Amino acid sequence: MAQAPADPGREGHLEQRILQVLTEAGSPVKLAQLVKECQAPKRELNQVLYRMKKELKVSLTSPATWCLGGTDPEGEGPAELALSSPAERPQQHAATIPETPGPQFSQQREEDIYRFLKDNGPQRALVIAQALGMRTAKDVNRDLYRMKSRHLLDMDEQSKAWTIYRPEDSGRRAKSASIIYQHNPINMICQNGPNSWISIANSEAIQIGHGNIITRQTVSREDGSAGPRHLPSMAPGDSSTWGTLVDPWGPQDIHMEQSILRRVQLGHSNEMRLHGVPSEGPAHIPPGSPPVSATAAGPEASFEARIPSPGTHPEGEAAQRIHMKSCFLEDATIGNSNKMSISPGVAGPGGVAGSGEGEPGEDAGRRPADTQSRSHFPRDIGQPITPSHSKLTPKLETMTLGNRSHKAAEGSHYVDEASHEGSWWGGGI
């Protein structure tokens, strides 16, 4: 007779209870005691225990006696002991289970573990032990599982790496990055988790950051002329127009590789106006020294833009880091508080991507040699950049780096006045 599959939720609860009992005991526990403490049938408890044994979470020290930790090639856990006689058990137990440290010593070690993982990210138990001056993972296993039972740490089941526990990541372990395909005309992506990953490629009309505004106006009058081209008026602090961003603006890591991105704004508090088809004219590059650091060499480039949001950031000033490799970018701005207006027209100053007020630039008299490539760095960004390294990617068009100084917006707003393809990322990636 086929056995019904176990309930994953109950198994997870039972596993947490087992870890808690073993942690509080501080020494091997008999199966009968586990049955009593966990209030579960012996058969069900055995199934969970042997599954946890395969996952190196617990191990057998003697028949029907369990303790924390497991064995693997790196020695991440106490070795299984085959006790030949009861007389040998005390000595072997002493060799397997380290002496219980005092409360102050244990608390200090937990603080060291937490600080190490916070500074260095997910690590295996052996690396943590060596960083704290110990030799084997079993020296810290008891502390790690005790901290896990108190929801201070969490462990990835596949990599066996320990990390700081975050409630928003609960139940999402071992999942791959979010892949979003743009099937709809407009995609609104708001993902606030600290370890969230979003992958998007070959899209148009994109803003990545906080406090952004995007509009598109392609409504034509009966005589064929275009309607008014202006941003809608928005009163400061109007909760009906701004987004519902509540959490402080956090840092963003954006990776783009082999992507086609047109009409893109990277940064915060930017405004984009789309009037029909994008122009083919050169961009107006404003003078000045925008506070955006950049490094470029060949087909790969990285940028960092500081977030100008009001208020304080408990973990220091957050930044948006953009890494691009082998991308096609057209009509793009990188920085904060920029305005970009894209209008239909012939080659000339009709298309603007700049950090000014969105007005056309006076570059109609530019020499033909200047219009061959519409992408370059201002000469004073971060560190000197030679002309041979001035291209970010194989092809960039209408590229602007820089910030404006006006006060940053406090939310993100999207206005759609006609059907178009676009994506808006706000509230943190």
Curated annotation (Swiss-Prot):
Q: Where does this protein reside within or beyond the cell?
A: Cytoplasm; Nucleus
| Span of the annotated motif RIP homotypic interaction motif (RHIM) 1 | 195-219
- UniProt lists compositionally biased (Basic and acidic residues) regions at 407-420
What's this protein's name?
Answer: Z-DNA-binding protein 1
- Give the span(s) annotated as Disordered: 68-107, 277-299, 339-429
Regarding tissue, the record states:
Highly expressed in lymphatic tissues including lymph node, leukocytes, tonsil, bone marrow and spleen. Expressed to a lesser extent in thymus, lung and liver.
Question: Which positions fall inside the Z-binding domain?
Answer: 8-70, 103-166
**Source organism of this protein record:** Homo sapiens
Cited InterPro entries: RHIM, WH-like_DNA-bd_sf, WH_DNA-bd_sf, Z_dom, ZBP1
Where is it chiefly localized? cytoplasm
**What lineage does UniProt assign to this protein's organism?**
Eukaryota, Metazoa, Chordata, Craniata, Vertebrata
